[in-house]
């Protein structure tokens, strides 16, 4: 199988073909996802909650991300693999570059960082040094203590305009992908249409170029609170492989996420 690349996703955007992505943390699930046609994966700092059992993503280290990135890469050698730079791992451009090198040596194709226009210098430096960057706007879980919890972001004209401005700034600095989390559908549509780069949504409606889900949410392994945007595909299919195939099919057809999974 040919490797999936950033150019592959750019082509999807140009052809208006929605694509599905998922978080992965280990060899076995990565292998299964790849075998069923999920060719874009994220080693997310969500592992702090789903794998390590913390109540936030903040305790996750660069070493944790690198460890899981290496495992996922062994399971899915041809996938486009994104890896989060965790909390306080990119407070300066130099620190970001050093930590990006660590996770890319472990097998990542691209790093994801959370934040707006204040990251422009960092994004530019990484891009100039051959480190592809995925931005992340909206609900950025590393900022949970600022937000006062996990809440929808970008409601109201001023907040929406700010997110659009941030998205354009990240793109201009060289970001090649953008994740939009927990924002109103109307804003997600504005941002997706304004950017030339592919936009991946989670809790942003079905108007983005792609979708991502935390794998545990896709299989109903939530341990309590179920996010509004989550759907348990395993409950409907009774089989993990069939659940993955249904997730892909519903994303590509625009069935998922539906109105019941979206914010306004």
Curated annotation (Swiss-Prot):
It holds the Pfam family Pantoate_transf. Keywords: Cytoplasm, Magnesium, Metal-binding, Pantothenate biosynthesis, Transferase. One of its GO terms (biological process) is pantothenate biosynthetic process. The keyword Transferase applies. It is found in: Cytoplasm. One of its GO terms (molecular function) is magnesium ion binding. Its main location: cytoplasm. Homodecamer; pentamer of dimers. Belongs to the PanB family. Catalyzes the reversible reaction in which hydroxymethyl group from 5,10-methylenetetrahydrofolate is transferred onto alpha-ketoisovalerate to form ketopantoate. This is 3-methyl-2-oxobutanoate hydroxymethyltransferase. The lineage of its organism: Bacteria, Pseudomonadati, Pseudomonadota, Gammaproteobacteria, Enterobacterales. The gene is panB.
């Amino acid at each position: 199988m040919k490797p999936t690349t950033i150019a592959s996703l750019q082509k999807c955007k140009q052809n208006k073909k929605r694509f599905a992505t998922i978080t992965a943390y280990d060899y076995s699930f990565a292998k299964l996802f790849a075998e069923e046609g999920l060719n874009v994966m994220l080693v997310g700092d969500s592992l702090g909650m789903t794998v390590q059992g913390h109540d936030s993503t903040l305790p996750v280290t660069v070493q944790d991300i690198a460890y899981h990135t290496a495992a996922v890469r062994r399971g899915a050698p041809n996938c486009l693999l994104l890896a989060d730079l965790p909390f306080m791992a990119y407070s300066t451009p130099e620190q970001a570059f050093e930590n990006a090198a660590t996770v890319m040596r472990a097998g990542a194709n691209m790093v994801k960082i959370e934040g707006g226009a204040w990251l422009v210098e960092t994004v530019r430096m990484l891009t100039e040094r051959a480190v592809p960057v995925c931005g992340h706007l909206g609900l950025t879980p590393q900022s949970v203590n600022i937000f006062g919890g996990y809440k929808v972001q970008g409601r109201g004209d001023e907040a929406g305009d700010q997110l659009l401005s941030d998205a354009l700034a990240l793109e201009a600095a060289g970001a090649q992908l953008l994740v939009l989390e927990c924002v109103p559908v109307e804003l997600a549509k504005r941002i997706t249409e304004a950017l030339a780069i592919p936009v991946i949504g989670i809790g942003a409606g079905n108007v983005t170029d792609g979708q991502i889900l935390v794998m545990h949410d896709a299989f109903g392994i939530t341990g309590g609170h179920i996010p509004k945007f989550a759907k348990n595909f395993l409950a409907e299919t009774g089989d993990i492989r069939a659940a993955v195939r249904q997730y892909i099919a519903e994303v590509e057809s625009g069935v998922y996420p539906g109105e019941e999974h979206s914010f306004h």
